[in-house]
Amino acid sequence: HQELLIDILKAEWGFDGYVVSDWGAALETEANANGGLDLEMPGPGNVWGASLLSAIKDGKVDEELIDDKVKRILTVAEFSKKFERHGFNPEEAIDQPTHRTLLRKAAADGMVLLKNDGLLPLQSNIKKLAIIGPNAKHAQIIGGGSASLKPHYEVHPEEALRSRLDPEIDITYAKGCHTHKYLPRVNESLMDGEQGFLVEYFDGHNFGENLILSEHLIGNKFWVFEGFAKEIISKQARPNISVRFSCAYTPNISGHHEFEIFGIGQCRLLVDGQEVIDNWTQTDPGEAFFTFSSASKKGMVDLQQGRSYNIEMEYHFEGSFPAVYLGCQAPDAMDLFQEAVTAAKDADQVILIVGTNSDWETEGNDRVEFSLPADQNKLIEAVLHANQNTVVIVNAGSPIEMPWIDDANAVMQTWFAGQEFGNALVDVLTGEVNPSGRLPTSFPKKIEDTPAYQFYPGTNQQMNYDEKLLVGYRWYDRSSVPALFPFGHGLSYTQFQYSNLEVQVIKNNQVTCKFIVKNTGLVMGAEVSQCYVAFEHSTNAEPIKTLQGFAKEILNPQEEKQIEITLAARNFSYWDISTKSWEIRQGSYELLIGSSASNIHLRATIMLEQVQGVLEPLV
């Protein structure tokens, strides 16, 4: 995009680094070269290399553009002292106590108490606690796709609650339901011999002939970005590579075992030589592996406890990069749902931890609904009916529908809180940390109550963002649609009172807002005061109000402080398309001080004169 990447980013803004593509996103040589792209990733590229050289020779790409790209890449390499290092340094990971403390604090500070009718913080008289939910023992601490990293350790809610609460409390655990989008990995502890699968790479289509090499791999998701076939499969050097995964598997429970396979290319699954799944003869488009994968196919096999079975998956790479998936779900030893309901009935208090995982919230595909995956809503409703002393913990990275919200007495959104998630959660549940997180987005009551709903998914995978300026809380204001929980919402274990708003307009249209916030409760807490600006003559295509400033202040019980939020001229401006500048319109502006987009406590009005073409962008 020449205007954005060359004219604005590089020329107007003076950016002297280089522009890199998303992985596999560069599809055209000339358009990318002339549009400002400097580095194609991953390498070796498809649109650079020989294709770029041909475009230069044909006069379709100016050689001066290539010189600029090379200069930018070398400049960054020099700045990062790349030329002073020889070879690759070994990867390092630093795990220090100060890092752990910071991670724990950040996780706790980000948790948002959505609703609390007296259940939190937890009381000290609990005798029997039920920890329920698919995210209790194995929470989702990080997003899927490229956001997935390998932490030094992980602290999950169930283990943290058991280790931190009074040992006299009788604690039970029940999963409640499965939530996987794709079946989980084969249990390595039930494989005979070395850990994981024996993976054999063959040159050609015939399995068993022309073996290149073999290795053992653990897991169920095998792709080039995590080492699988990285040095083996090359369409240039070896256009026909086949891979066989095999292991001896001894189930620890009898019954129907469900298997699942898919990948970029063709794959099939055999158990004791009998084909169970054919995702080879005919494949359909899927959404995994950045939508390059075939659609999932599943098969059921009746396996007997204690007997050894030979599992084989055959795979032929055909597509963008090598990737294949194998999952297996053994039968449950008991009714997970009924186990959870029984545990809830027998407990004084329930901590119910639900949510999503890296299959549901990841890059490469959209969420098409706001419901919690699988049977979690059903589980929540049943547990709430069994025990009103239930705290619902939502371990998800984005908004979800909550059809059970009226029946819940306490709900907290924890997001994907990192490796210290469990400890941070217990800190907040017990009151060691008073929750102070605020919602960075509006939570709708249902998916239809979202700005983009009427435009999604568009036509032929092309969607216009026709909500334009009315995104998030701006759309809810203008449409008069109430959100389930508004932007900026978040409760505390204490209460705050606002008073005495004073507004002053000083030079260059700078505005100061001063007001008093008092902690009227019994415990220390932090309040996030938000300042919104509303122009009296805004059109229907514009937001009614916009957040322009905020301040977070920690207050002791009964303490009050004067809070000051300063707004610059830029905070009252709009972008004029005709003059291509930030301008202020003459008229009345209302300043609204509140604790969320829907909870406004103080108001004041000021008058500003028109200012044209003199405003600098915020830095």
Stretches with model-predicted labels:
Residues 6-7, 12-14, 20-29, 47-49, ...:
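C-terminal non-catalytic regions of proteins with extracellular/luminal or membrane-system context
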Residues 16-18, 38-39:
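Structural preference for beta-strand elements that scaffold enzyme active sites
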Residues 36, 49-84:
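Long, well-ordered, tryptophan-enriched scaffold segments
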Residues 44:
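Short secondary-structure boundary segments
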Residues 65-69, 84-91, 122-124, 442:
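Short coil/turn segments at secondary-structure boundaries
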